[in-house]
Amino acid sequence: MSEIVAEKLIDIKSVQFSFNKHFTLTSGLKSPVYVDCRKIISFIDERDFIMNEAVEYFKKNNLNFDLVAGGETAGIPYAAIISEKIKKPMLYVRKKSKGFGKNQQIEGSFKEEQRAILIEDLATDGGSKVIFVEAMREAGLAVKDIFVIFYYDIFNFESSVLGKLNVKIHSLCTWKDIISVM
């Protein structure tokens, strides 16, 4: 499964290389490789395949949750599709509250202690996910799992910020899968 997802990412040119001018990742790290999972939303067949694989992954790994939460902004379309496929309510989490209106960081309806899975497009070192997990927990949600389509998987997870938050990161494919199909 993971190698097929990797092939799909390569086919739609989500995997890009730039050896002269490195990409700056969300983590601040520089990389000659950039995986742009946001492109998936524009490719219907590939998107449908990948989202179906996500649903199968949840079943095979017995992930238990009551709500699907999309992280602003890249996680929102995938959370919406997954939520629809598995018939579970959806939320979305902002990086920070809007500062006007109801000044909410989390949109959607939920109850304290409900279990939520955070959906994002990808993760490098997981640092940007901390904001979402902390906001969800502060709101009373139980968060122990994060699901991403692509995970670089090049850092020691246990010593990472997410490892210290006691959350598990799940992915459909990693950098090793991309390399194995190139």
Would you name each region that the model predicts?
Residues 1-63:
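Active-site-facing substrate-recognition patch
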Residues 2-12, 134-182:
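PRPP-dependent phosphoribosyltransferase catalytic core
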Residues 28, 68, 90:
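Conserved hydrophobic/aromatic pocket- or pore-lining residues that grip, position, or stack substrates
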Residues 56, 80, 84, 134, ...:
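Short, well-ordered alpha-helices that flank and scaffold nucleotide-derived cofactor binding pockets
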Residues 63-72, 147-148:
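Short glycine-rich phosphate-binding loop at a beta-alpha junction
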Residues 66, 114, 144:
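Conserved acidic residues
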Residues 78-117, 125-130:
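Short, glycine/charge-rich flexible loops or terminal/linker lids adjacent to PRPP-binding catalytic cores
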